[in-house]
């Protein structure tokens, strides 16, 4: 690696270089190599990322000599010195002698959060947890050998969840089946096959009538476009606001959070990006909008955090739905070195449910967070 500076003469002067050391690796491991996971939206499961022989870290370089009136900086890498995958996330330049330290914008009450508990679901590969608005049902999806299926647990008088029961009528799609909202008025189900250019979005609205699920038709969005086969969604309790985590031509990075408002004809208007404060240059998704229509919890790998994907909270600042507060990390008691995502907050019981991956295995976890802490109003 070599750094050179041009002072306006058109010639670059070397101001820092490293000679190859064939015995000592340039970077040292900062965490176990098998802790890297990503959330594969197309397969709706957590996959182990390709192994990286030498994990990335942060390197601080202080120039050995000053160059006055520098107008250009050239950084040369010799990637042939190290085998395996290579990736440079960012390069920062500062005139300070103090190194720039990455910091995590952590929620103020993170130290008060209780210990996280595992919801026992032996033999299942849980994802997309949802609590019904009456607090009596835990709904989640689990991936079998053939497809994703929907299961429901009933809450007993002791507050414990019953053994899961498969909901056949909610598991009819050929591969993807998941619930994003389960209310007394309507249910939002994802994973529906759809044709692009038809305004269909892969979601449908259901109603539970006499213990039977009745489809109210496909959820349609004006000019809907999504690079992936599926998306993650959340919807306001009255159905007027829809928020999606998708990737389009207008995303700031990978997938972004978008909102859409319901029209008089029952369809939804054009998706609008929720802004640069909440959407990073990486991926945002897995959102849940709480009942105040101001608080949103979601998962992202685009902000300083503890692992691959962390869970954050943000607050809507005005009526445009495009201005949000800086996302706050829910802290290391919730977020691990691995994948933490698909959050769902049960306001009635004041518990956050989420999926955590440990050594490639997904667990459904729960933790108590007071409503007065998580929701500002």
Which residues are covered by each model-predicted region?
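Short, conserved micro-motifs composed of acidic
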Residues: 98-377
């Amino acid at each position: 690696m070599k750094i050179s500076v041009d002072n306006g003469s058109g010639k670059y002067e070397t101001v820092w270089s490293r000679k190859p050391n064939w015995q000592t690796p340039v970077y040292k491991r900062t965490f176990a190599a098998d802790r890297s996971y990503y959330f594969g939206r197309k397969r709706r499961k957590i996959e182990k990322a390709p192994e990286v022989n030498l994990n990335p870290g942060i390197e601080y370089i202080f120039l050995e000599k000053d160059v006055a009136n520098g107008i250009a900086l050239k950084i040369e890498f010799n990637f042939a010195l190290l085998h395996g995958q290579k990736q440079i996330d960012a390069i920062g330049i500062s005139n300070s002698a103090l190194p720039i330290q990455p910091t995590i914008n952590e929620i103020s009450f993170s130290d008060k959060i209780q210990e996280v508990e595992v919801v026992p679901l032996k033999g299942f590969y849980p994802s997309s947890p949802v609590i019904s608005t009456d607090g009596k049902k835990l709904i989640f999806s689990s991936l079998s050998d053939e497809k994703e299926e929907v299961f429901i647990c009933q809450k007993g008088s002791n507050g414990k969840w019953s053994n899961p029961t498969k909901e056949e009528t909610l598991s009819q799609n050929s591969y993807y089946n998941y619930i994003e909202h389960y209310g007394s008025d309507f249910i939002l189900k994802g994973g529906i096959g759809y044709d692009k250019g038809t305004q269909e979005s892969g979601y449908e609205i259901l109603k539970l009538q006499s213990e039977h699920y009745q489809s109210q038709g496909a959820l349609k969005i004006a000019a809907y476009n999504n690079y992936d086969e599926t998306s993650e969604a959340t919807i306001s309790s009255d159905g007027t606001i829809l928020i999606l985590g998708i990737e389009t031509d207008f995303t700031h990075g990978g997938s972004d959070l978008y909102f859409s408002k319901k029209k008089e004809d029952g369809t939804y208007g054009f998706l609008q990006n929720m802004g640069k404060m909440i959407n990073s240059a990486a991926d945002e998704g897995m959102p849940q909008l709480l009942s105040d229509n101001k608080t949103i919890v979601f998962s992202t790998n685009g902000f300083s955090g503890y692992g691959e994907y962390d869970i954050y909270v943000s607050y809507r600042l005005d009526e445009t739905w495009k201005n949000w507060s800086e996302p706050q990390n829910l802290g290391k008691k919730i977020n691990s070195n691995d994948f933490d995502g698909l959050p769902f907050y049960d306001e009635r019981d004041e518990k956050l449910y989420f999926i955590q991956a440990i050594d490639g295995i997904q667990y459904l976890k729960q933790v108590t967070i007071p409503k007065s802490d998580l929701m500002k109003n």
